[in-house]
Amino acid sequence: MTESILAAQIEVGEHHTATWLGMTVNTDTVLSTAIAALIVLALAFYLRSKVTSTAVPGGVQLFFEAITIQMRGQVESAIGMRIAPFVLPLAVTIFVFILISNWLSVLPVQYTDEHGQTTELLKPAAADINYVLALALFVFVCYHAAGIWRRGIVGHPIKLLKGHVAILAPINLVEEIAKPISLSLRLFGNIFAGGILVALIALFPPYIMWAPNAIWKSFDLFVGAIQAFIFALLTILYFSQAMELEEDHH
């Protein structure tokens, strides 16, 4: 089996690169991310037009309203505090963006490269560490900016380090630094592992390869949804912790 894997020359984590303005970029990740962003923007404008119209709300609008209301209720009851009005739409947008960028890889869009190998055109963006780290750092910067806006430029760092027990300040600092790392690696690890399994399935004989590949692709849709949901849920939790005041508790 080991010899077969080596002979197949499986390249997991490899990306097609190009140089733009002196910078090396992963073009497959950029393509998947750009398509996902366009879909999210189109969906946002569509929902906006439905909200401002006088017609009866459509199924898509009712679906997202139900998700938003249900998520708000569950999160607030779980963490015991109210969340800022802008946090939930941001988290839902991140959820949809991650979900679409990962689900694009399920589409049977392939091409033959210069070496004669068949390659997927749309790869899961979260299999690129640069993508997930950029998302995690974006969330990290945003919730700290929100915390400074709510608590003050002095009050936020003090509350952040002190927490509920001042003696735990060093541990709180390490925990805060680890948040973007754990947030990104959790998403990256699960999607990257899926890419490895797809590469191993490619070693099956052609006449039976479709069966395990179809089963895994179906499961991959579920994994992508769960990981996008966890990322969005942790985003809400981090914002709530950063903006927490004593009077916010129920």
From Swiss-Prot:
GO CC term, one of those recorded: proton-transporting ATP synthase complex
Keyword field: ATP synthesis, Cell membrane, CF(0), Hydrogen ion transport, Ion transport, Membrane, Transmembrane, Transmembrane helix, Transport
Transmembrane portions of the chain: 27-47, 83-103, 129-149, 191-211, 219-239
Record-linked Pfam families: ATP-synt_A (PF00119)
SUPFAM superfamilies in alphabetical order: F1F0 ATP synthase subunit A
Gene Ontology terms describing biological process: proton motive force-driven plasma membrane ATP synthesis
Keyword Cell membrane on entry: yes
HAMAP family: ATP_synth_a_bact
Oligomeric form and interacting partners: F-type ATPases have 2 components, CF(1) - the catalytic core - and CF(0) - the membrane proton channel. CF(1) has five subunits: alpha(3), beta(3), gamma(1), delta(1), epsilon(1). CF(0) has three main subunits: a(1), b(2) and c(9-12). The alpha and beta chains form an alternating ring which encloses part of the gamma chain. CF(1) is attached to CF(0) by a central stalk formed by the gamma and epsilon chains, while a peripheral stalk is formed by the delta and b chains.
Protein family according to the UniProt entry: Belongs to the ATPase A chain family.
Name of the protein in its database record: ATP synthase subunit a
